[in-house]
Amino acid sequence: MKKYKSEFIPEFKKNYLSPVYWFTWFVLGMIAGISMFPPSFRDPVLAKIGRWVGRLSRKARRRATINLSLCFPEKSDTEREIIVDNMFATALQSIVMMAELAIRGPEKFQKRVFWKGLEILEEIRHNNRNVIFLVPHGWSVDIPAMLLAAQGEKMAAMFHQQRNPVIDYVWNSVRRKFGGRLHSREDGIKPFIQSVRQGYWGYYLPDQDHGPEYSEFADFFATYKATLPIIGRLMNISQAMIIPLFPVYDEKKHFLTIEVRPPMDACIASADNKMIARQMNKTVEILVGSHPEQYIWVLKLLKTRKSNEADPYP
């Protein structure tokens, strides 16, 4: 990655063509090729492949199962297994959908997209307000930002670099296909804040586990998690509205609904860190609860526990 003043821009390197990465390029080529087929044809096929891959990915499946058992203890083992299967199906469908958007562009793609809460975006544009979208970790998480960038909005987001440099290069190139800025989490949050203050629409994912030092333990579904209560600070420093957003893909209708919810400003403006953390988790619950298969449950979301509790992912 090549570093510029306040952003990272993907940079191709010759060693990406070495034999060690040939299989990666083959898989990426397959994804690009499959994205050219109509969703009505490819989605059922991708669902079967995704569920099959999910059965083989034992470690990832185990993490997802642990997360779901803690968050939804009222569900049966069978119900949770169905969610995990559907999650892996959604994952592959979303990756291919992102490739389709990057290759074919947004014109036809947008015909299969519905913005629920579009009036909120229009009000932001009308008032020329700074905004940070609070976006739970869904499989289609990059697509709304790409669509907004394609509409001419300046977007800024933070990202984690992938272990495979070819995947990292391609993925971040796709994210920037229609413009916008990417900020590495390794550089801290200041470059992201700077972009928001410059009028970029921020894109913040709130649900990663950052450890106990700066986090607050707050209720999360039926359990709790260590949540970094940073959005209050981001709102104040960036003078930005905090707008929840979450994409949901319907594999049967082949339609993406992007839900935009009213600003969180009123409920966090005077709240302490513990209340802010709870409001963040509550927002994730509202957006994800009715569509759990859309969420990336394979993350170690609940790794940080209270002092008397063991790591749930031994």
From Swiss-Prot:
Q: Which InterPro entries match?
A: LipA_acyltrans, Lipid_A_MsbB
Q: Name one GO molecular function term.
A: acyltransferase activity, transferring groups other than amino-acyl groups
Induction per UniProt is: Induced under limited magnesium growth conditions by the PhoP/PhoQ two-component system.
A GO biological-process term: Kdo2-lipid A biosynthetic process
Q: What happens when the gene is disrupted?
A: A msbB1/msbB2 double mutant is impaired in its capacity to cause TNF-alpha production by human monocytes and to cause rupture and inflammatory destruction of the epithelial barrier in the rabbit ligated intestinal loop model of shigellosis. Mutants have no defect in their ability to enter into epithelial cells.
Q: Name one GO cellular component term.
A: plasma membrane
Record pathway:
Glycolipid biosynthesis; KDO(2)-lipid A biosynthesis; KDO(2)-lipid A from CMP-3-deoxy-D-manno-octulosonate and lipid IV(A): step 4/4; Bacterial outer membrane biogenesis; lipopolysaccharide biosynthesis
TM ranges: 17-37
Q: What EC number(s) is this enzyme filed under?
A: 2.3.1.243
**Motif HXXXXD motif: which residue numbers?**
137-142
Q: Which UniProt keywords apply?
A: Acyltransferase, Cell inner membrane, Cell membrane, Lipopolysaccharide biosynthesis, Membrane, Plasmid, Transferase, Transmembrane, Transmembrane helix
- Where is this protein primarily located? membrane
Keyword field contains ATP-binding: no
Top enzyme category: transferase
Protein family: Belongs to the LpxL/LpxM/LpxP family. LpxM subfamily.
Name recorded for this polypeptide:
Lipid A biosynthesis acyltransferase 2
The gene behind this protein is lpxM2
